[in-house]
Amino acid sequence: MRDAVTSLIRNYDTTGRYFDRDAIESLKDYFASGNDRITVAAMINSQSAEIVKAAANSLFEAVPELLLAGGNAYTTRRFSACLRDMDYYLRYGTYALIAGDMDVLNERVLQGLRETYNSLGVPIAPTVRGIQFLKDAIKEMAAAAGIANTAFIDEPFDHMTRELSEVDL
């Protein structure tokens, strides 16, 4: 797992360059958001069950057929698996949020996930919506805590949804 600083250093070291203006700005942005990242991670840690519950409620309200007979969240086992997966996305999204780098998501979450879901018949679209509802719940909490710039919250959750949504042409 890498973080924003390690990734930046690796990129510049590979090409044998000193940090340029863009690199310095990237570092400034990352460190400037550090306290907010930690605050949000602490909020997620203390309220993870509530965040997953709120996101699941939003998902099942938006896509109620998931809970009907034949739906992918029908039966206690499938419903529990859905909540477990949402918690998994929340946890790894939090790691990436702190790191400021999506490497942990690529390595531990996304690699092969779309193929696995497709082979099991798990629809991707509701998964993507659920991840977006997680992001929305976190952004609401951050705004309520007075965090004005929440763009760093978008990064990991948008990355997951973008990667899961990709379609090979």
Curated annotation (Swiss-Prot):
GO terms under cellular component: phycobilisome; plasma membrane-derived thylakoid membrane
Domain of life: Bacteria
Example GO BP: photosynthesis
Keywords: Antenna complex, Bile pigment, Chromophore, Electron transport, Membrane, Methylation, Photosynthesis, Phycobilisome, Thylakoid, Transport
Compartments in which it is found: Cellular thylakoid membrane
Residues annotated with N4-methylasparagine modification: N72
Membrane topology summary: Peripheral membrane protein
Positions annotated to bind (2R,3E)-phycocyanobilin: C82
UniProt entry tagged with the keyword Phosphoprotein: no
Family: Belongs to the phycobiliprotein family.
Name of the protein in its database record: Allophycocyanin subunit beta-18
Species the sequence originates in: Picosynechococcus sp. (strain ATCC 27264 / PCC 7002 / PR-6)
